[in-house]
Amino acid sequence: MTEYRNFLLLFITSLSVIYPCTGISWLGLTINGSSVGWNQTHHCKLLDGLVPDQQQLCKRNLELMHSIVRAARLTKSACTSSFSDMRWNWSSIESAPHFTPDLAKGTREAAFVVSLAAAVVSHAIARACASGDLPSCSCAAMPSEQAAPDFRWGGCGDNLRYYGLQMGSAFSDAPMRNRRSGPQDFRLMQLHNNAVGRQVLMDSLEMKCKCHGVSGSCSVKTCWKGLQDISTISADLKSKYLSATKVIPRQIGTRRQLVPREMEVRPVGENELVYLVSSPDYCTQNAKQGSLGTTDRQCNKTASGSESCGLMCCGRGYNAYTEVLVERCQCKYHWCCYVSCKTCKRTVERYVSK
């Protein structure tokens, strides 16, 4: 772990970043954001990560900041879960608000993190509205479609369309509206991927219901529109990451647009992630490319997917070691009311890449 942190520090201090990744610098709020009261305007300048336009939004909407700090934490957690079985070492996200080249350039990985962050911000705000945590919003409006005979609209839906998207997009897109945030191509890429993330979030709205009736008969249901969990949204975006389109800038009329590099006759789809710079294979350690390599990464000997030793180890082979796990076992419930368990030891074999 110490070697990894030293290597990451070398990345941050020794490289000149080609593309500034200000669009997701706010993920650095996970470091000390929870310790700030967010009840005075000067708090908006206390921590690194917020660009001037986001600081202004913070000053006008201090009550949002607890949700945004939570969104930063959820984004990192979702990224960790989504890429734990991939060669790309998601740990570079921990260096926010400063990033290494794997996220500081317009890579496929940056496209995923940017879109996920945009989705999670709006998700966190919409949920906070429904939970009563924000004085400026409340539950979502009742759906306009007619309720079926077996249910009625009610409950408290996540306020996505009328508040979560509005405030989330204002926050996420603010850095990329400023020309000083980087080259236009990079800003166009981030704005596009932000929109993709929010579209996936909108598509995740689903009907959720609560049953009423004698002895749980569910003769009547009260239903509302709620968002799916972040893990589901992250999984959808990972699928888009795997099929992301490499793009190049092109002047079309008076507008500069991004078009697919390989199929320039086809416009970029509104629902596909795009990237500007091809990623390395992340097999070996390379500071200039932002690759930590896969040496000592755990792999699965029997799997066939990205977590398999064949793919994770890049053909270098793997080392095996045994680990003794101490677990609770043979648990019994006693009336009333406690559970007693024995302690068991189990030896498992682990594999790490050479």
From Swiss-Prot:
A lipid is attached at residue 215 (O-palmitoleoyl serine). Keywords: Developmental protein, Disulfide bond, Extracellular matrix, Glycoprotein, Lipoprotein, Secreted, Signal, Wnt signaling pathway. GO terms for biological process: camera-type eye development; canonical Wnt signaling pathway; cell fate commitment; cell migration; cell migration involved in gastrulation; cell-cell adhesion; central nervous system development; convergent extension. It comes from the Eukaryota. One of its GO terms (cellular component) is plasma membrane. GO terms for molecular function: cytokine activity; frizzled binding; protein heterodimerization activity. Ligand for fzd5, a member of the G-protein coupled frizzled receptor family. Plays a role in early eye development, possibly through wnt non-canonical signaling. Promotes eye formation, at least partially, by antagonizing the Wnt/beta-catenin pathway. In addition, promotes coherence of eye field cells, potentially contributing to the coordinated morphogenetic behaviors of cells in the nascent eye field. This is Protein Wnt-11. The gene is wnt11.
